[in-house]
Amino acid sequence: MAPKKKVAGLIKLQIVAGQANPAPPVGPALGQHGVNIMEFCKAYNAATENQRGNVIPVEITVYEDRSFTFTLKTPPAAKLLLKAAGVAKGSAEPHKTKVAKVTWDQVREIAETKKTDLNANDVDAAAKIIAGTARSMGITVE
């Protein structure tokens, strides 16, 4: 077995799927760790090709020899809720002004998608987490 590579850094970014380019925020974040920026952009765009339009968080592990690996996460719950509710942004005063409504079925569907990234044991617990996010955005869950 080959010796383990030493980790030099961990970078977390949220990039629109299929649209990673060397411009900020991607370029500076990777450049300071000495990563080949174009190599990452091509790999990320290829990996997220089928999810175009969604914001996909990525966790990039940079090693001392300047090589890297990355893990794709599920889209942020807030973005999925906005898409389900059909609104551009959440409420400025979430507990006073409600901007939209989503059904429990939509919340459960989002919870199914997010379950791997959430700290929940089952779909019901994940749905409660998503409902809490909706509430804090001014979206009513029915």
From Swiss-Prot:
Keyword Oxidoreductase: no
Annotated signal peptide: none
Summary of the function given for this chain in its UniProt record: Forms part of the ribosomal stalk which helps the ribosome interact with GTP-bound translation factors.
Record-given protein name: Large ribosomal subunit protein uL11
UniProt PTM: One or more lysine residues are methylated.
GO biological process, one term: translation
SMART domains recorded: RL11
A GO molecular-function annotation: structural constituent of ribosome
An example Gene Ontology CC term for this record: peptidoglycan-based cell wall
Keywords: Isopeptide bond, Methylation, Ribonucleoprotein, Ribosomal protein, RNA-binding, rRNA-binding, Ubl conjugation
Family recorded in the similarity comment: Belongs to the universal ribosomal protein uL11 family.
UniProt-listed InterPro entries: Ribosomal_uL11 (IPR000911), Ribosomal_uL11_bac-typ (IPR006519), Ribosomal_uL11_C (IPR020783), Ribosomal_uL11_C_sf (IPR036769), Ribosomal_uL11_CS (IPR020785), Ribosomal_uL11_N (IPR020784), Ribosomal_uL11_N_sf (IPR036796)
Cross-link position per record: Isoglutamyl lysine isopeptide (Lys-Gln) (interchain with Q-Cter in protein Pup): K101
Assembly notes: Part of the ribosomal stalk of the 50S ribosomal subunit. Interacts with L10 and the large rRNA to form the base of the stalk. L10 forms an elongated spine to which L12 dimers bind in a sequential fashion forming a multimeric L10(L12)X complex.
PANTHER family membership: 60S RIBOSOMAL PROTEIN L12, LARGE RIBOSOMAL SUBUNIT PROTEIN UL11M
HAMAP family given in the database record: Ribosomal_uL11
